[in-house]
């Protein structure tokens, strides 16, 4: 299966799916310093107890949420857990609030009657009342529509947060909810509307996109995840694609690499981020290596 976006709006769908999902084969023969494969990495530096960096997929698929034994062992041994954001009740409330407009605008007035009616029809079929849809930001409606119907389970990141709290581990965040939601709020109204239009047009292939990402993730194939992301941008507006990839992936990689330094200096940490952030020339594995850490693939 090879799903290839063909419109400017599709780059948003693919990149957002990759970013939000990120997002079991054997790789014993892959070179450890290539960073092309593997989800769990030991991070070491002289004089500090080693820590672990784990690539997640923001999915409730049973094959994703059940931690493999090496990952579970690293998690259990950690003195604290660091996620992209702390998923406590207040953060979840903030995320939910960020989906809605509070300036008096209504979705219909921003996107027009025809697109609004199509959005409401699909949302209603999924059990979401128009009263709620009417106050959504255009990007928020699109992101919700990207979630397959029935995909309402607890995703891996929430499992890690829940288990850390249950085990009495301190939980840290590399980013704030405001920073993550700001990635979408910063999109122009034109781009938000294009995203919503293209999401509605491509509802039938979003499931296929997610399936392809899931296969790459369960194969621990970081190189393939990068290829899927890069393929999504080939036929898209170059400036639009570059800007979105820079903001959603690259800039966040540098920010997270810097912010995890205090955790790594403490040692015995379990740090979990979307798997797409691990690989590539500007991925976290390469950035940590350049800072003098030794990275060893564990799983």
Task: Name the predicted role of every residue range.
Residues 1-10:
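N-terminal secretory signal peptides that target proteins for export/translocation
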Residues 33, 64, 249-253:
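A conditional alpha-helix N-cap/helix-loop micro-motif detector
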Residues 39-244, 248:
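Structured, acidic catalytic/metal-binding patches in enzyme active sites
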Residues 242-299:
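A cross-kingdom marker for long, charged
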């Amino acid at each position: 299966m090879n799903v290839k976006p063909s419109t400017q709006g599709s780059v948003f769908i693919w990149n957002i799916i990759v970013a939000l999902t990120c997002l079991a084969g054997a790789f014993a023969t892959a070179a450890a310093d290539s960073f092309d494969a593997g989800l769990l990495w030991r991070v070491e530096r002289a004089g500090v107890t080693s820590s672990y960096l784990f690539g997640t997929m923001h999915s409730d698929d049973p094959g994703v949420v059940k931690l493999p034994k090496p990952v579970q062992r690293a998690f259990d041994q950690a003195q604290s857990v660091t996620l992209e954001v702390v998923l406590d009740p207040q953060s979840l409330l903030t995320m939910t609030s960020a989906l809605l407009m509070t300036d008096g605008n209504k979705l219909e007035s921003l996107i027009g009657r025809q697109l609004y009616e199509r959005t409401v029809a699909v949302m209603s079929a999924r059990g979401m009342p128009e009263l709620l849809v009417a106050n959504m930001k255009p990007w928020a409606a699109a992101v919700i529509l990207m979630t397959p119907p029935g995909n309402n389970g607890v995703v891996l990141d929430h499992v890690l947060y829940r288990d850390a709290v249950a085990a009495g581990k301190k939980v840290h965040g590399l980013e704030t909810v405001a920073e993550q939601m700001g990635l979408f709020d910063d999109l122009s109204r034109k781009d938000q509307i294009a995203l919503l239009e293209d999401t509605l047009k491509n509802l039938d292939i979003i499931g296929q996109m997610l399936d392809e990402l899931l296969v790459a993730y369960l194969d621990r194939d970081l190189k393939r995840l990068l290829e899927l992301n890069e393929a999504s941008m080939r036929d898209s507006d170059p400036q639009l694609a570059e800007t979105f990839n820079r903001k959603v992936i690259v800039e966040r990689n540098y920010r997270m690499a810097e912010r995890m330094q205090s955790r790594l200096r403490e040692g015995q940490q379990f740090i979990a981020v979307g798997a797409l952030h691990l690989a590539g020339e500007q991925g976290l594995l390469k950035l940590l290596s350049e800072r003098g850490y030794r990275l060893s693939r564990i799983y």
